[in-house]
Design a protein with these regions (language model features):
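NTP-dependent nucleotidyl-transfer catalytic core
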Residues: 1-224
Length: 224
């Protein structure tokens, strides 16, 4: 797994480094006789996606003459204006007086599709191809037994005694594996953490039969 950028903006130079390293590693291992599968993990769940949709909604209104301020948590890059302009070119002012929640959700999914297509285009131009673009959202979709990948991974960890509840939150005993601290899986308010998604994703990889997992991550994952 490598690159795995959020679909909330263009790929940057760091992603290019990870693409070069990941692709080269896969090619060398494949040449050495390994059966290698390359995957891009799409971080398409969580509040950053709502913030992205709201960012486009604000730029859309501004481009149509509304005096609307960009919230602090939103994305201010010029590419957001480009996406908003694309919506104007297609829909005009259709969304200007729409229900704010409906507008944000529509723009979120539209902006997501736009940026994901851009990421596909850039990686293909770079010469990097993936066997799978894996959606984080799919980890929360129940199977025929009514259990999602998140549910199954929690069950597996619980059976091995690796999780506990403290102050209303569910924790993973990662310190038992030489981590610097235990990690929260589910917050006290019931919200899943990014780490929970990461655990479920890796559990899903093992369910699919992979026996050796290689991750190329950014510095923000150093603690993992």
């Amino acid at each position: 797994e490598y690159i795995s950028a959020n679909p909330t903006g263009p790929l940057h130079v760091g992603h290019g480094r990870w693409a070069a390293l990941g692709d080269a590693t896969a090619r060398v291992m494949r040449h050495a006789g390994y059966d290698v599968f390359e995957e891009f993990y799409i971080n398409d769940a969580g509040t950053q996606m709502d913030n992205f949709g709201e960012s486009v909604a604000v730029r859309y209104q501004q481009l149509l003459g509304r005096d609307v301020e960009m919230p602090e948590a939103c994305y201010a890059g010029s590419y957001v204006k480009d996406i908003a302009q694309t919506i104007i070119d297609e829909d005009g002012d259709k969304w200007l007086d729409a229900d704010p929640k409906e507008r944000m959700e529509n723009f979120r999914e539209g902006a997501y599709a736009y940026e994901l297509a851009e990421q596909h285009r850039v990686t293909e131009r770079f010469g990097t191809t993936f066997g799978c673009w894996f959606s984080e959202r799919s980890l929360y979709v129940p199977d025929e037994d009514g259990l999602s990948a998140v549910d199954r991974s929690l069950k597996a960890m619980d059976e091995k005694g690796y999780i506990y509840v403290e102050d209303g939150a569910t924790w993973f005993r990662s310190s038992a594996f030489d981590d610097e601290k235990d990690r929260v899986l589910i917050k006290a308010n019931g919200e899943m953490t990014y780490f929970m998604s990461d655990v479920a994703y890796h559990y899903n990889k093992m369910e699919r039969g992979f026996d050796h997992l290689i991750n190329i991550w950014g510095a923000d994952h150093h603690g993992y």
